[in-house]
Curated annotation (Swiss-Prot):
GO terms for molecular function: metalloaminopeptidase activity. InterPro entries: Creatinase/aminopeptidase-like (IPR036005), Pept_M24 (IPR000994). It comes from the Bacteria. SUPFAM superfamilies: Creatinase/aminopeptidase. One of its GO terms (cellular component) is cytosol. This is Uncharacterized protein in adk 3'region. It comes from Micrococcus luteus.
Length: 84
């Protein structure tokens, strides 16, 4: 809480929205486990895109400053903001 003097309590609707988002993410991560060696980051992105669409969810990344994918993913030595 750097720079804050109080704790913001979430409302019941905010907590429900957070719970729903967590469930969608959990389902997307479970679906991604279907990936095997040789599974590309583009294929992983496609899995996430399908799960999000089926649940009526959207990606925070897709379209943000023209980012072309639903997920940011990096492999090996890449650290951040990898494009599948």
């Amino acid at each position: 809480m750097i720079g804050r003097r109080s704790l913001e309590l979430k409302t019941a609707p905010q907590l429900l929205a957070m719970q729903r988002a967590g469930v969608v993410l959990s389902e997307a991560l479970d679906a991604a486990l279907a990936g095997a060696p040789g599974f590309t980051t583009a294929e992983l992105d496609a899995v996430f895109a399908v799960v999000l669409a089926e649940r009526g969810a959207t990606s925070n990344f897709l379209g943000y400053y023209d980012f072309p994918a639903s997920i940011c993913t990096s492999v090996n030595e890449e650290v951040v903001h990898g494009i599948p």
